[in-house]
């Protein structure tokens, strides 16, 4: 189901922001800008790329990250690369 997959990506991204990137997630929304609002820098992006690949099996490129302005954009970029499960499971 698309919703549960989306929710699972959202939950994992929240954990990555909190645990791996030391972001205070209480002040982060989907509309929060990654650099201006969340305060991510190049080191945080590198840590995030590794954590996303480790936890979700999704390899984002530097180009993918540069196209993301907000947390919601990042979530959508991850979601687009998450393999969809077979409908028959």
Swiss-Prot record:
Classification via PROSITE patterns: CARRIER (PS50075)
GO cellular component terms, A-Z: cytoplasm
Record-linked Pfam families: PP-binding
PTM per Swiss-Prot/TrEMBL: 4'-phosphopantetheine is transferred from CoA to a specific serine of apo-ACP, leading to the activated holo-ACP form.
Modified residues (O-(pantetheine 4'-phosphoryl)serine): 42
Pathway linked to the protein: Siderophore biosynthesis; mycobactin biosynthesis
InterPro entries: ACP-like_sf, PP-bd_ACP
Keywords: Cytoplasm, Phosphopantetheine, Phosphoprotein
Carrier domain mapped to chain residues: 7-82
Keyword Ion transport attributed: no
Subcellular location: Cytoplasm
Gene3D superfamilies linked: ACP-like
Role, per record: Acyl carrier protein involved in the formation of acyl-S-ACP intermediates within the mycobactin biosynthesis process.
Protein name: Acyl carrier protein MbtL
Species the sequence originates in: Mycobacterium sp. (strain MCS)
